[in-house]
Amino acid sequence: MPRRADPARKPAMLAAIIDALRDRPLSSVTFRSLADALDVSTYALVYHFGTHDELVVEIVQALVARQEGIIDAERSSSPTLEAHLEAVRESWHGAMQPLTRPLLRLELEAALLEVVRPDLRAGARDVHSRWLQWQTDSLMRLGVDRDRAALEARLLVDQLYGLQFDLVISGDDSGISALSQRAIDDYRDRITALLAAPLA
């Protein structure tokens, strides 16, 4: 009788794969390179992940999933500007952590990979849309009209995305931290003014 597969084995291997990629590009992923890094057989990787493309998709989806908790937590809370801003700050502070920095690089690389390989459909490019939708929905819950909410959401999300890219390539923690705080403060001031303005 064949031995039953260990259900914890695949998640553990996926976590180890992501850890191994902290100092390697996503484009370098091969079954052989990962097998050597994890000290497992290529057969074990094929057994758990299938094809090379399926492996890449699972890696990207694991990277994307780590951001979902912050969005879901804010959506389940009472709609206040401070709760929304705190969720934005929490997300940014998470991105600034030394252990998270390599994951930012991998997420950016994954999104760019999907630009030239849309058949992968791993969801990396969808993260940007997800953040835009979250920000827009949060502002609408506060009473901002849809068009202005969408504009403000995109302005902040694109600012923070740009700062993440800067952080990855420059490593200027203090400079990027100051700029992110400025972007969030300006966002807070604009939304506060919008909410205080009389309805037309």
Say what each PLM segment does.
Residues M1-A8, P198-A200:
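N-terminal intrinsically disordered/low-complexity leader segments
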Residues A12, A16, A20-E58:
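Helix-turn-helix
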Residues A12, A16-R24, G69-A73, L106, ...:
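Solvent-exposed, amphipathic alpha-helical segments
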Residues G50-E54, S76-P79, V115, D119, ...:
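Residues in soluble alpha-helical coiled-coils and helical-bundle/repeat scaffolds
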Residues E58, I71-L104, E152-L156:
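Hydrophobic alpha-helical connector segments
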Residues Q61-E68:
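Short, basic, alpha-helical segments at the C-terminal edge of helix-turn-helix-like DNA-binding modules
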Residues E68-E74, P98-L108, V115-G143, R154, ...:
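Amphipathic alpha-helical packing segments from all-alpha helical-bundle domains
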Residues L120-R125, R141-A200:
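Hydrophobic/aromatic-rich alpha-helical bundle segments in the mid-to-C-terminal region
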